Amino acid sequence: TPHSPPMEALNAKVADAATKSIVHYSFYFGATTTNPDIVPTLDKNRVCGVKLFMGASTGNMLVDRMEVLRKVFANAGILIAAHCEEQSIISANTTAFKEKYGEDPDIKYHPQIRSAEACVYSSSLAIRLAKENNARLHILHISTAQELDLFEDKPLSEKKITAEACVSHLYFYDKDYEALKGHIKCNPSIKTLEDRNALRKALSTNRIDVIQSLIHITEPTRPEPI
């Protein structure tokens, strides 16, 4: 619930799960630019990690100020799960594509606006901060071949920095926008065939540690049920 204050939202989720869940559960604490001082106070037995959006996201959860990022990485005694896209690159691309194609550029340009460059830059920064602070980092939904080179090909038990791939990035590539339009619009964007194939190949190595089954689709409308 990004629109709620993170601690309030966390408490609400825990209370709701307590009445409904039949399995063990835990939730992320959502880091924002205004709450990094709460991070070191989190109960490790209650919170599974800190969710960090290093790029455009929903509501107030974008964290793009370096001093805040440094605080989070220095003080988090639990896992940091990071969505990595560099906002300044996305903003510049958005402006350029709107100037060229109008206020609402075609969906096929989505992977060029939310580009591979934005992902690689942000993931590289997250990994650098994690190494500087000996933090436990998990980078969510890797979408480019270049990012794979940032991760070590060794057993999970020997790593503090891990990565995941999402089914949407493993299945689709940019040419699919022509037929599927906004139904495959997600962040990070679905990119090239080369990126998709590199992600698939990485599944047989130790560079990808987790396969995520679902990523939020950003298209605001859905087709009616048949």
Name each model-derived stretch.
Residues 215-226:
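Single conserved hydrophobic/aromatic residue that forms the stacking wall/gate
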Residues 1-20:
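Metal-associated gating/positioning segment near the N- to mid-region
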Residues 16-30:
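A glycine-rich helix N-cap at a beta->alpha junction
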Residues 37-211:
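Histidine/acidic residue-rich metal-binding segments in metalloenzymes
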Residues 1, 27-29, 140, 211-213:
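Active-site neighborhood of phospho(di)ester-bond hydrolases with catalytic His/Asp-centered motifs
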Residues 3-6, 62, 147, 226:
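Alpha-helix N-cap/helix-start motif
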